[in-house]
C-alpha cells in the first residue's frame, strides 16, 4: 500500500518497514502517509485536506500532476510559487493525475468556483478537454496561463534553434493553446541529480530555471494589473499585431494552415461584446 500511494513519507515508511523486517531499528515516520488522488497543496504546508483563501482577490492557483508529488519532484512548482509570493500573491496548488477524468474534473471545478483565483497557472500537458469538449479550468473567468516543464535538459534547450523539442512544443504549447490557454514560457528542464554511489543511480528531475520563472511571474502579474483596469472602469488600449513577409503583400498575416485575418476579426468582434470601443470591425 505504501509503495502504491507514492510520496516521500510513504516511501520513507516503506523503507522503515523493510528495515524492521531485516531486524534493524527504524524510527517511526510521523505524519499522514496517504496521498489523495486530487487535492490542495500549499508551499509551506504541503498537501492539505481543506483550503480557504484569506485574500481572494490576490489568489493564484497552480494546477499540476499528482505524479510530481508522488515522486517528490516539486522544485519547479515550489520556485514558481515563491516567485508569486514575492510579488504579493497567495498561492495554492491543485493536483490530480489528469484533468480529463470527470470525477477529478468535478472536484477541480468546484474548488475553482469557491476560490475565485485572479489567475490560473497550468503545469499539466496536452489538452485538458474531456470527451464533452470542456476543461474543468474553463469554469474560471480568469486567464489560464500555460507553463512548460521541459523533458529535455538545459543544454539541448539552449542549443536547439526552436528551444523546446517537437514533443515539448506539442505537449506544452500547441495543444494547450488550442484549448485557449496563454503560453507563458518554460520554467524547468530535466536534469540528472548527483549519482548515488551506493544505489548506482541518478534521478532525473525538473530543475527550475530562475530567470524564466521570474519572467513568467512578471507576465502574469502584468495581466492581472491589466484586468484591474477593467474593474476600475479604465479601459486599456489593446492592439492586435499581425505578421507579414517583406515584398509579398499577398502573404499578409500569413500562417501555415490558419486564417490569421479571420481570427483577428473574430477577436475584435468578441471584444466589442465586452463594451470595448471598437469601430469598423472587418467582416473577414
Where are these regions (language model features)?
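An N-terminal assembly and electron-transfer interface module characteristic of large anaerobic redox
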Residues: 1-284
Amino acid at each position: 500500500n505504501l509503495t502504491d500511494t507514492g510520496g516521500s513519507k510513504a516511501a520513507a515508511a516503506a523503507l522503515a518497514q523493510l528495515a524492521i523486517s531485516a531486524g534493524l531499528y527504524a524510527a517511526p515516520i510521523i505524519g499522514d502517509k496517504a496521498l489523495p488522488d486530487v487535492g490542495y497543496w500549499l508551499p509551506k504546508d504541503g498537501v492539505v485536506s481543506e483550503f480557504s483563501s484569506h485574500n481572494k482577490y490576490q489568489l493564484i492557483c497552480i494546477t499540476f500532476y499528482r505524479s510530481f508529488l508522488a515522486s517528490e519532484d516539486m522544485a519547479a512548482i515550489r520556485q514558481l510559487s515563491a516567485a508569486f509570493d514575492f510579488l504579493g500573491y497567495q498561492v495554492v496548488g491543485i493536483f490530480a493525475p489528469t484533468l480529463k477524468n470527470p470525477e477529478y474534473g468535478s472536484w477541480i471545478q468546484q474548488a475553482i468556483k469557491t476560490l475565485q483565483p485572479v489567475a490560473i497557472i497550468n503545469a499539466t500537458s496536452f489538452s485538458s478537454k474531456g470527451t464533452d469538449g470542456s476543461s474543468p479550468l474553463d469554469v474560471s473567468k480568469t486567464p489560464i496561463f500555460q507553463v512548460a516543464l521541459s523533458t529535455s535538459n538545459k543544454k539541448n534547450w539552449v542549443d536547439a534553434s526552436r528551444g523546446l523539442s517537437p514533443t515539448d512544443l506539442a505537449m506544452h504549447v500547441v495543444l494547450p493553446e488550442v484549448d485557449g490557454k496563454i503560453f507563458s514560457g518554460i520554467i524547468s528542464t530535466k536534469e540528472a541529480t548527483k549519482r548515488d554511489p551506493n544505489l548506482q543511480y541518478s534521478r532525473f528531475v525538473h530543475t527550475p530555471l530562475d530567470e524564466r520563472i521570474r519572467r513568467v511571474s512578471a507576465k502574469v502579474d502584468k495581466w492581472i494589473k491589466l484586468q484591474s483596469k477593467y474593474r476600475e472602469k479604465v479601459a486599456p488600449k489593446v492592439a492586435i499585431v499581425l505578421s507579414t513577409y517583406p515584398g509579398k503583400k499577398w502573404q499578409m498575416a500569413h500562417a501555415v494552415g490558419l486564417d490569421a485575418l479571420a481570427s483577428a476579426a473574430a477577436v475584435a468582434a468578441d471584444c466589442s461584446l465586452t463594451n470595448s470601443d471598437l469601430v469598423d470591425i472587418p467582416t473577414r
